[in-house]
């Protein structure tokens, strides 16, 4: 299991691989025993990524399946706000930088999405090679390692 993010007093857990599911669990250090009836806020089995991790921006959770189905959920309730398809396959986890979400595909595409309750594609970029590794942020730059290159992406 991968604990990727927390939302207020909850941990968001992605089981990954096999039959992945995403669970929101109330963080309670005093809890003991079986807490499934008292501390599980929501549990989702559809459109959950096997490899990449979800990301929370504001009150929204964003994730993409390995096959490119991008979904936005309300982080508190787990209810879907919207879903859309991005071509390609995805292993790299999304990142949030400069007020936008970045999704890098195994085919070398970078989709830039504006966060919010509606799907809003800001731009689509094609790079020379595909991405398996998750990008990193340093200062105002995004570093993304493809199969053949290391990219530095920054607004100048």
Regions found by a protein language model. Give the residues of each.
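Noncatalytic, solvent-exposed loop/strand surfaces
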Residues: 4-156
């Amino acid at each position: 299991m991968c604990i990727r993010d927390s939302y207020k007093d909850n941990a968001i857990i992605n089981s990954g691989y096999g039959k992945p599911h995403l669970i929101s669990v109330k963080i309670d250090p005093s809890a003991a025993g079986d807490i499934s009836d008292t501390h599980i806020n929501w549990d989702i089995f559809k459109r959950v990524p096997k490899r990449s991790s979800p990301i929370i921006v504001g009150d929204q959770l964003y994730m993409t399946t390995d096959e490119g189905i991008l979904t936005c959920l309300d982080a508190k309730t787990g209810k879907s706000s919207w879903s859309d398809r991005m071509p390609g396959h995805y292993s790299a986890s999304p990142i949030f930088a400069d007020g936008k979400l970045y999704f890098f595909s195994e085919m070398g595409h970078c989709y830039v999405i504006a966060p919010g309750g509606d799907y809003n594609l800001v731009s689509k970029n094609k790079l020379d090679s595909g991405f398996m590794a998750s990008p990193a942020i340093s200062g105002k730059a995004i570093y993304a390692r493809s199969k053949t290159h290391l990219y530095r992406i920054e607004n100048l």
